[in-house]
Amino acid sequence: MDSPSGSLSPVAIDLAGVSKSYGGKIVVNDLSFTIAAGECFGLLGPNGAGKSTITRMILGMTSPSVGKITVLGAQEPGQVRLARAKIGIVSQFDNLDLEFTVRENLLVYGRYFRMSTREIETVIPSLLEFARLESKANTRVADLSGGMKRRLTLARALINDPQLLILDEPTTGLDPHARHLIWERLRSLLARGKTILLTTHIMEEAERLCDRLCVLEAGRKIAEGRPHALIEEQIGCPVIEIYGGDPQELSLLIRPNARRLEISGETLFCYTPDPEQVRAQLRAYSNLRLLERPPNLEDVFLRLTGREMEK
């Protein structure tokens, strides 16, 4: 695919003091963040955290109750048409025409942007190559695998060469192979200068793709930063997951060697700079299963909210 045409504003999206209420209930609460052109910025949080409402406001589909939103230099929602022409959208659900072929889906979608058939036909080969669907151009969408449909949805969003891509849970429901292929395609777009706003509840996805992210809970921002910086700041040591015993009893035993302990269900999470010492303390408990691993964004979310991310 061609590189993005035209110069980009150094700021792709800016939210300043944005709140949104429905029927007296606050669903987004005093939210501010800035997304630089060319970066991948993640909105990370469980269902109900406000991610969908935030993207709807960015797209001008609903107005903030309080605050200001600027997208690609256009203030939403008043100048929404100026911005929408430069935005590609990949929703959580494919919304493809199942009875049309892959090529026909691209042709129909291009016309929404008032592209001529000739213009669309010119870009279709590069879009098929990008999506690795060259051999499926004349295949009905109904006959594609789930991963192929997601790649087609992504390719379709690129038909007007947008400056900004908004991706809503782009790999939910995909198997690991299909998920990794989508991630590889998204990294190639970032290498070409596209800006991506990614909403996800998949921690690994956010950690692999995002330059920066905003962690949300109940419409509030509870953390913002680079994934690995957040992990180091909030956790900063190895993690041992302990299964099979009484978490309360085990906590008392290993607390002297733990930087922090968290209990989630029947699992005890031990954050410790000295994993070997903790293992030694637990050797007498033959029924335990221990998993030692590096810290990740799931730990950050648990640390900040006291609960695991809802799947």
UniProtKB/Swiss-Prot annotation:
Disulfide bonds: none annotated. GO terms for cellular component: plasma membrane. It holds the Pfam family ABC_tran. It is found in: Cell inner membrane. Coiled coil: none annotated. PROSITE patterns: ABC_TRANSPORTER_1 (PS00211), ABC_TRANSPORTER_2 (PS50893), NODI (PS51240). The keyword Transport applies. The keyword rRNA-binding does not apply. Its main location: membrane. GO terms for molecular function: ATP binding; ATP hydrolysis activity; transmembrane transporter activity. SMART domains: AAA (SM00382). Its EC number is 7.6.2.-. It is a peripheral membrane protein. Keywords: ATP-binding, Cell inner membrane, Cell membrane, Membrane, Nodulation, Nucleotide-binding, Plasmid, Translocase, Transport. InterPro entries: AAA+_ATPase (IPR003593), ABC_transporter-like_ATP-bd (IPR003439), ABC_transporter-like_CS (IPR017871), ABC_transporter_ATP-binding (IPR050763), ABC_transptNodI (IPR005978), P-loop_NTPase (IPR027417). ATP binds at residues 45-52. Residues 13-243 form the ABC transporter domain. Part of the ABC transporter complex NodIJ involved in the export of the nodulation factors (Nod factors), the bacterial signal molecules that induce symbiosis and subsequent nodulation induction. Nod factors are LCO (lipo-chitin oligosaccharide), a modified beta-1,4-linked N-acetylglucosamine oligosaccharide. This subunit is responsible for energy coupling to the transport system. Belongs to the ABC transporter superfamily. Lipooligosaccharide exporter (TC 3.A.1.102) family. The complex is composed of two ATP-binding proteins (NodI) and two transmembrane proteins (NodJ). This is Nod factor export ATP-binding protein I.
